[in-house]
């Protein structure tokens, strides 16, 4: 797990344990070494500075302890797949996320 300028908000009292499973959408196989990036989001939808970056293990799994309750932006990036990004409301002691990454779309051009 890599911390990126962890804001003070990460140390709030109500905290959750997050589990991630990153899979290939086309065959359901795990994605190893994918970056799972976590950013807090304020009530106006603005992303806070700092955050955390996790890496998935060979089984496509990653976890994080100590996420404060509130809105969280989760992004998953890895070469060869479309970037996943979505906001989630963290409001329970434990959350599990199954993220299915899609292959990149074909690029279309008018130039030859």
Feature map (PLM): residue ranges:
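Extracellular Ig-like/FN3 beta-sandwich strand-entry sites
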Residues: 15, 69-71, 81, 94
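Short, acidic Ser/Thr/Gly-rich low-complexity loop/linker segments typical of extracellular
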Residues: 43-61
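Surface-exposed loops/turns
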Residues: 58, 68-69
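Short strand-edge motifs at loop-to-beta-strand transitions and within beta-strands
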Residues: 52, 62, 86, 95-97
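Beta-strand-rich domain onsets/edges
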Residues: 2-18, 23-25, 29, 96-112
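Hydrophobic loop/turn residues within beta-sheet-rich immunoglobulin-like superfamily modules
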Residues: 67, 91-93, 102
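A short, solvent-exposed loop/turn motif at the edges and junctions
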Residues: 71, 75-88
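Short, ordered, surface-exposed loop/turn motifs in non-cytosolic proteins
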Residues: 16, 26-44
């Amino acid at each position: 797990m890599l911390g990126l300028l962890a804001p003070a908000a990460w140390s709030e009292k109500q905290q959750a344990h997050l589990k991630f499973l990153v899979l290939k959408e086309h065959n359901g196989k795990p994605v190893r070494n994918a970056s799972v990036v976590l950013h807090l989001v304020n009530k106006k939808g603005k992303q806070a500075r700092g955050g955390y970056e996790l890496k998935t293990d060979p089984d496509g799994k990653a976890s994080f302890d100590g996420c404060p309750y509130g809105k969280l932006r989760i992004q998953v990036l890895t070469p060869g797949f479309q970037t996943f990004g979505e906001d989630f409301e963290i409001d329970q002691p434990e959350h599990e996320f199954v993220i299915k990454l899609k292959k990149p779309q074909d690029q279309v051009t008018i130039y030859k």
